[in-house]
């Protein structure tokens, strides 16, 4: 069997609205720029040495209909005025021969920043726990990311939040880490 180790990853997000939940999900994927692919959800490992690239650069490497492995956070509602959010957090180790973590989070009533920071902290804590150092993990106000002395290179997040605007209309938010196998 071929080694399916992704070498690149990009992050994206989207918001969609529609008459049905499925339509709103499709529109959220379109907004995120990934509706033209066959999406397969995978768990939360950022592969060793995977290069983080821009969405635009990542999309240039893909073909419509291609099977696309993603860590996908998704949330939907048709409740008027309901705030929904989804977020992906990531933590990259300093030792790039070690794997990192991707975390997905979806919630109701959280702002984009709240959802994003929750997902980012979750990824950082998962990575720190694999090193037996979860208690040493700290937020660095200057760098605006979680740090673990010489162990975590960077943490970030991407989030999408919106409010259901119309009665009887479905709204979906997505955030995704798209893993590219070259």
From Swiss-Prot:
Q: Name one Pfam family in it.
A: PvlArgDC
Q: Which cofactor does it need?
A: pyruvate
Molecular function terms, GO-annotated:
arginine decarboxylase activity
- Which reactions does this protein catalyse? L-arginine + H(+) = agmatine + CO2
Details of cofactor binding: Binds 1 pyruvoyl group covalently per subunit.
Enzyme Commission number: 4.1.1.19
Where are the annotated coiled coils located?
none
Q: Which residues carry this modification: Pyruvic acid (Ser)?
A: 44
Q: Where is this site: Cleavage (non-hydrolytic)?
A: 43-44
Q: What does the UniProt keyword field contain? A: Decarboxylase, Lyase, Pyruvate
Enumerate the Gene Ontology biological process terms: arginine catabolic process
The main enzyme category here is lyase
Q: Which family does it belong to?
A: Belongs to the PdaD family.
Question: Which HAMAP family does this entry report, sorted A to Z?
Answer: PvlArgDC (MF_01404)
Which PANTHER family would you find in this protein's record? PYRUVOYL-DEPENDENT ARGININE DECARBOXYLASE
Q: What is this protein called?
A: Pyruvoyl-dependent arginine decarboxylase
Origin species: Picrophilus torridus (strain ATCC 700027 / DSM 9790 / JCM 10055 / NBRC 100828 / KAW 2/3)
């Amino acid at each position: 069997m071929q080694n399916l180790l992704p070498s690149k990853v990009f992050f994206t997000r989207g918001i969609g609205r529609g008459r049905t939940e499925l339509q709103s999900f499709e529109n959220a994927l379109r907004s995120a720029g990934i509706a033209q692919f066959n999406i397969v959800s995978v768990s939360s490992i950022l592969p060793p040495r995977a290069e983080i690239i821009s969405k635009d650069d990542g999309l240039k490497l893909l073909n419509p209909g291609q099977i696309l492995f993603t860590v996908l956070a998704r949330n939907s509602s048709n409740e008027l005025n309901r705030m929904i959010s989804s977020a992906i957090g990531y933590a990259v180790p300093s030792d790039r021969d070690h794997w990192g973590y991707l975390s997905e989070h979806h919630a109701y009533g959280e702002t984009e920043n709240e959802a994003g920071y929750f997902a980012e902290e979750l990824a950082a804590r998962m990575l720190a726990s694999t090193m037996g150092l979860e208690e040493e993990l700290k937020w660095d106000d200057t760098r605006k990311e979680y740090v673990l002395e010489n162990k975590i290179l960077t943490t970030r997040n991407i989030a999408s939040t919106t409010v259901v605007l119309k009665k009887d209309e479905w709204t979906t938010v997505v955030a995704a880490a798209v893993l590219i196998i070259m």
